Amino acid sequence: MPPSGPQGTLLLLPLLLLLLLRAVLAVPLERGAPNKEETPATESPDTGLYYHRYLQEVIDVLETDGHFREKLQAANAEDIKSGKLSRELDFVSHHVRTKLDELKRQEVSRLRMLLKAKMDAEQDPNVQVDHLNLLKQFEHLDPQNQHTFEARDLELLIQTATRDLAQYDAAHHEEFKRYEMLKEHERRRYLESLGEEQRKEAERRLEEQQRRHREHPKVNVPGSQAQLKEVWEELDGLDPNRFNPKTFFILHDINSDGVLDEQELEALFTKELEKVYDPKNEEDDMREMEEERLRMREHVMKNVDTNQDRLVTLGEFLASTQRKEFGDTGEGWETVEMHPAYTEEELRRFEEELAAREAELNAKAQRLSQETEALGRSQGRLEAQKRELQQAVLHMEQRKQQQQQQQQQGHKAPAAHPEGQLKFHPDTDDVPVPAPAGDQKEVDTSEKKLLERLPEVEVPQHL
């Protein structure tokens, strides 16, 4: 019986979802067994799901309940996916349910923040919101109950994550396909932009890079005897003539949980990938290397993972070594460049999509340019009106000053007496002297015109 301990408290869940629980199936509980020295817990790999943290926390809480852990041991993949296991949540201890309730309230709070962000974005027409993706954020929770964690929540969490992870690899393949099509599209556009001689030289250089990339040692089929023996010899430093599948499995079950998960499997392919890809070489694309790693892992899972739970048990691994294909070397593994990720028709549609997107962006840029020019012209008119207003105000002030000077000069000059004698008038500075009729009329007219124009002029706030 495998040793018990903290690493034996997790259960395998189909389709990588509950990868964090995988050790429970491999390590049964031993009641009354003496406590053994605890080994440091290994960090669980990120599933890539947007609710990964919530999923991880729910698993950590559930595995502390002895009753649920025992039911988890006895459950098979179908029990988990169908929701049968979720009903056992009714029998977990009160403090476990309390912790689960708090986790759900925290997740609901997080989703409410997302909803608030969505509403804020809707109020701004310039913000593009993917409403469908936002709504998907809620699919792993029971919308009828926002406060307590029930069996329905566990069932939804399992079903949603199982479905999402089943689509995870497909999404990666699609992303790689678009990457390859964009790369080919840019290559063709680059060649079209060159003159005839330059284009021939560029094509020759590209062909040379492709030739160097194809020249590599034979790549063994992942999971084959040749591939595993190479790891056994070069990575483990053991005698290839004494290859033992069971020992190999134990050596590469890094966290000793009784299964090889996807990360542990992918680590076995490093030596094969190094034959083809070198980050120092211009001709080797590291994005292609990661796609190659994914293809290798899928190949092994398809042929070894008989129950399709995305984990390889010791029994499944040993059974695969008995198959005829295990020792068949053949011509080796066919790499990515031997299997184009897209067809010419797919590339044509992709380029049409790019052209439409480019046209849309150009139209938007043109509209923005026109709006900028219109704002510039409006600003110019505003500046002209401001200068005209300033000149009118200055002119009016000058006229008033002239009138005041004329009034002062006319008031203080002594009047001549008819007999030739000067006659001085008493001081009447306190009495207002009206301006000449003609001048006063002209000032009134100027002020009236100025006041009539004021509503038409929008003076900036900084004036």
UniProtKB/Swiss-Prot annotation:
Where do the record's region annotations for Disordered lie?
A: 193-221, 368-463
In what residue span(s) does the EF-hand domain sit? 240-275, 292-327
Location in the cell reads:
Golgi apparatus, cis-Golgi network membrane; Cytoplasm; Secreted
User: Which InterPro entries would you find in this protein's record?
Assistant: EF-hand-dom_pair (IPR011992), EF_Hand_1_Ca_BS (IPR018247), EF_hand_dom (IPR002048), Nucleobindin (IPR040250)
Q: Which residues carry this modification: Phosphoserine?
A: S86, S369
Query: Which keywords does the record carry?
Result: Calcium, Coiled coil, Cytoplasm, DNA-binding, Golgi apparatus, Guanine-nucleotide releasing factor, Membrane, Metal-binding, Phosphoprotein, Repeat, Secreted, Signal
Q: Give the residues the record marks as binding Ca(2+) 2.
A: D305, N307, D309, E316
Its membrane topology, per UniProt? Answer: Peripheral membrane protein
Indicate whether Oxidoreductase appears among the record's keywords: no
Q: Name one GO biological process term.
A: small GTPase-mediated signal transduction
| Residue ranges of coiled coil | 150-218, 341-409
The residue ranges flagged as biased composition, category Basic and acidic residues, are 193-210, 439-463
Q: Where is the signal peptide?
A: 1-26
Binding-site residues for Ca(2+) 1, renumbered to this chain? D253, N255, D257, E264
Q: Where is this motif: GBA?
A: 303-333
Care to name a GO molecular-function term for this sequence? DNA binding
* DNA-binding region(s), chain positions: 172-218
Statement: the UniProt record of this protein carries the keyword Ion transport: no
Query: Which PANTHER family does UniProt cross-reference here?
Result: NUCLEOBINDIN (PTHR19237), NUCLEOBINDIN-1 (PTHR19237:SF21)
SUBUNIT field: Interacts (via GBA motif) with guanine nucleotide-binding protein G(i) alpha subunits GNAI1, GNAI2 and GNAI3 with higher affinity for GNAI1 and GNAI3 than for GNAI2. Preferentially interacts with inactive rather than active GNAI3. Interaction with GNAI3 is inhibited when NUCB1 binds calcium, probably due to a conformational change which renders the GBA motif inaccessible.
Per the entry, what this protein does is: Major calcium-binding protein of the Golgi which may have a role in calcium homeostasis. Acts as a non-receptor guanine nucleotide exchange factor which binds to and activates alpha subunits of guanine nucleotide-binding proteins (G proteins).
For domains, the record's comment is: The EF-hand domains are unfolded in the absence of Ca(2+) and fold upon Ca(2+) addition.
Protein's recorded name:
Nucleobindin-1
